[in-house]
Amino acid sequence: MALDKLLEQEAQSEIERIRAEARDRSQMIVAQAQERAQALIESRQRALETQRQAGIVRARSAADLDLNAARLTASESGMSQVYELVNQQITEITRVPEYRDILGRLIYQAREVITDAEAVEVNPAEAALARELVHDIAVRENPAIQGGVRVVARGGKSGITNTLAGRLERVRGELAPQVSRLLAE
């Protein structure tokens, strides 16, 4: 019986050793699985956070673009209104007494450029005034000319138009930043 007991104890020891190894191995497998799971969770959280941050950046960029587009639209609308108002003022300025001096300067400046001028063209409403200012060449009526003068030479093949609206248009690009700044204030 002692041999049976000895064999039984030995078998029991072997079983306990195998169980202990299995327990250790299973704990190690579980720990590794938990580490991998935790690493995967952290990786996914980082990826989600990165996506969230990218989404925030995209949303901010889209909002900035929308805001800038709205500002640009408002600025363009304001600029259009300003230039429309200025053009109305230019039309009205032709009716004030000081316009005689303005038209005289416009004619003089255009004739400085076209030295061999044959005629001065003005709006029919300004023809009488132009005839008072120009005595050495013909004054013709041209309904297309508004608030200024066109001086022609060489049978109409050469000429220059010098109008208030034309001058405004030439400096419009230079004035745009200043007008925009004033509108923004």
Swiss-Prot record:
Gene3D superfamilies per record: ATP synthase, E subunit, C-terminal (3.30.2320.30), F1F0 ATP synthase subunit B, membrane domain (1.20.5.620)
Gene for this chain: atpE
Protein name: V-type proton ATPase subunit E
Function, as annotated: Produces ATP from ADP in the presence of a proton gradient across the membrane.
One Pfam family, short name: vATP-synt_E
Family: Belongs to the V-ATPase E subunit family.
Keyword Transport: yes
Domain of life per record: Bacteria
Family matches, as InterPro entries: ATPase_E_C, ATPase_V1_Esu
Molecular function terms from GO: ATP binding; proton-transporting ATP synthase activity, rotational mechanism; proton-transporting ATPase activity, rotational mechanism
